[in-house]
Amino acid sequence: MGGEGPGSDDIVKKMAQLMMQGAVMLDKTCPADGLPLFKLKTGDVVCPVHGKVVIVASDEEARDVEVEEIIREVRYRAARNVMKGLEEDNVDTVSKWLGVLETAERILAIRRGSRQGQGSVRGEGRESK
């Protein structure tokens, strides 16, 4: 962790702010910077610098999380490009990116269905059972 770098006072302030809001400091650290992680009242685990962190127990879970993040990014970019195509009245662009968006949505639905069939749900915006 170290308290000597630039912005370390801001990090300490953010950590104190999290604790004043009822967050609990965990015995786990952020893989990116080694800072302690905090569990919010909502159950989310956050790094004071990076925000929300997903904790995984295996390499397979890590791959699943990585794939989910990639698909989310593809969805975001596709939606942005659809909007751009609409603004430019470019039917070809809209059609192309709607296809990408539909494929990403289909992949997510299949992945969610297969995980629910296994009895576990992981990831952002879904409850753990």
UniProtKB/Swiss-Prot annotation:
Domain of life: Archaea
Segments traversing the membrane: none
Pfam family membership, one: Auto_anti-p27
InterPro entries attached to this UniProt entry: SSSCA1, UPF0148
Family in the record: Belongs to the UPF0148 family.
This protein's name: UPF0148 protein APE_0207
UniProt source species: Aeropyrum pernix (strain ATCC 700893 / DSM 11879 / JCM 9820 / NBRC 100138 / K1)
